[in-house]
Amino acid sequence: MSTITSREIRLKSRPEGMPAADNFELAESALPAPSQNELLVKNLYMSVDPYMRGRMMDRQSYLPPFQIGQPLEGGSIGEVVESNNDQFNAGDIVLGMLGWREYFVSNGKGLMRFEPGNAPLQAFLGTLGMTGLTAYSGLLEVGKPAEGETVFVSAASGAVG
C-alpha cells in the first residue's frame, strides 16, 4: 500500500470554559505505508471521556496535555488493515489510544488485540471499557458494599455512575 490520506481532529486552541467547535479543526494528513514491524489500523470507534477536558488545558496532571495542532488522543477500537508486525494480522480488532483519526500507523506497542465475543465493539469503550471498569472498581474497592446496604447508581452522575 502506498501513502494514505487520513482525516483527523486536532486541538486548534485551548478552550476557556466549555469547549466549542472553534477549539478544534478537521485536517488531513498523509501517512506512509507501514514499514517493518509496523501496522496500519483503521479506527472504527473513538471514545469521548471526561478526563479529556483536563488534557485540553496546558497544565501538569497525571497525563500530559494535548498539543496544539496535534490529533486528540483517546480510547479507540480499530481494525488492522495492513501488517508488517508478527504480533498482528490484517483483520485483527485492536484496542488502544489510537487518536482521533481515520487511520493510524503503529509499531503495536500499547495495542491490545481482542475477540469481542457477543458484545458490540463499542461496548469496550464504555460499559466494558475504562468507564465501566472505573465504576465497577469504585463500587467494590472504594464503596465496599456490605450485605443489607442499598446501592444507588445514577446515570445522570456521569460516565462512571
What residue spans do the PLM features occupy?
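Short polar catalytic/cofactor-binding loops
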Residues: 11-17, 46-48
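Short glycine/threonine/proline-enriched tight-turn/helix- or strand-capping micro-motif at secondary-structure
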Residues: 18-30, 60
